[in-house]
Amino acid sequence: MQVRWAPSDGSLGDYTYQQDMSSSDKLSADDVLNTLDKSNRHILTCILVCGLAWSPLAFTGLCPSFVVKASENSSFIGVADEFDLTGDASWLAESTTTFYMVGNMIGGMFIPPLADHYGRLPVFVATVLLMAVGGMISAFSTSIMMFCIMRMIHGIFYTAAGLAGWVLGYENTPLRLRFFTSVYFGVMWVVGACFLGLLAYILPDWRYLMFCISVPNIFVALLIYMTVPESLHFLVSSQQNEKIEAWLEKIRGPKGDISASDIVEDRDENGSSFKTLCREMWKHKMFIVYVLVMTYIWIVDTFIYFGLAFYSTNLAGNLYLNFVLMSLVEAPAYIFSPIFMNKYGRKVLISGTHIIAGLSFLGIVLSSEAWHIHFWLLGKFAISCSFMSIYMFASEIFPTDGRNKCIGFCETLSRFGGMLSPYLSHLTAVHALAPAITLSLIAVSGGLLTLILPETLNTKLPSTIAETASRRQLIDDKSDSSSN
């Protein structure tokens, strides 16, 4: 039996079912998932629970907005207040976020391979639990250095939990539900961010806040362990036939017509060795340009996104309301970005949203203070659209034989933008509008550089670096032939 799911019109999320019976054919894990009904309760539970974990992840990633140093007009007690980090020592408060981003880089490099070896589920559960423990211990820090170290540990497990949770949920999702899965994960992040603002209002002390935002991870980890199955893709790739049979019986029912022997591993995702990849890149210099441009865009988006999140509590007005509004504006970005990408193209959307963000920040410089919050919100919406889209764009630009390595390279280096983001507020010492001017210039530069990249809408995924490097010419040839 052969099962295929193909886009009926080239768009994401719109798939037509085609089945061709042939007993000699083998199925991939995706083929098996696509035979499941979209209302399958086990799959829906997996999606809902894995996405639910992103709410407490938002607690961890965005808590510096309050914990480090809240607005001077606020009664919130942050680490800068408790440890008297003022004057020449004020930089130590922001360094807690730098330590956190360093932890992100470490976790991103060393823990994902454990998920490939031991499984997505155990790594997901373990890292979520360790996040809870690390967060609760950090609430009892006796010095700023102890807090920095605990934040770095937090960062290590945050990245691993986020990646493992996303991969586990995505790999257990049929193709026709992956659009919904992407939107749901993003919305749950927004829900977590909004709850963080509410908790900070109720608990205006960094110790109480850190402890309370860490506890939910314990319950989430237990819920994951009790309800979420291991990734079928992982079980197939590791050839665990007994567990595959158990997975099939649980998810598809005891009377299913597919067995472990019918499923084969899709091996084209393993990619080339690092040495081979470097050799191919040297042959095709344009591909190196694509990697550098994509890395720069990733750094820009990380810097602006976290910079806005952390800086929102320094804006005029109620810091809690400002933070919640900055978070809520992400929800429509996560919902509409995939639609805009399929209608106007990846490059147009990402370049355009960077330009819109840049103009929004420029509007802050040119307008009265009453309009500032509106321009900040528009800028946050635009950069959230780009951040949502860049993962798909990168997956379609980078070829199969180097996709994981290239995306990992971009993701890791993007944390340098995260390291710099907490220092955005320090630019007010130069001029009150210096943060807005800086963000505007950086956003516009990212938008203009995006134009160097090839459009990937309605094109098949490249298999080799040579295909990616020549893609611009291929698209030009295709457009010329269609016009004739």
UniProtKB/Swiss-Prot annotation:
- Pfam families, alphabetically? Sugar_tr
SUPFAM superfamilies given in the database record? MFS general substrate transporter
Provide the protein's localization. Answer: Membrane
Task: Enumerate the transmembrane spans.
Answer: 43-63, 95-115, 121-141, 144-164, 183-203, 208-228, 286-306, 321-341, 348-368, 373-393, 433-453
Q: Which domain of life is it from?
A: Eukaryota
The membrane topology of this protein is:
Multi-pass membrane protein
Which keywords are on file for this protein? Answer: Membrane, Transmembrane, Transmembrane helix, Transport
Q: Does the keyword Nuclease apply?
A: no
GO cellular component terms, semicolon-separated: membrane
Q: Give GO terms: molecular function aspect only.
A: transmembrane transporter activity
**Family in the record:** Belongs to the major facilitator superfamily. Sugar transporter (TC 2.A.1.1) family.
Instruction: Tell me the protein's name.
Output: Putative transporter B0252.3
- From which organism does this entry originate? Caenorhabditis elegans
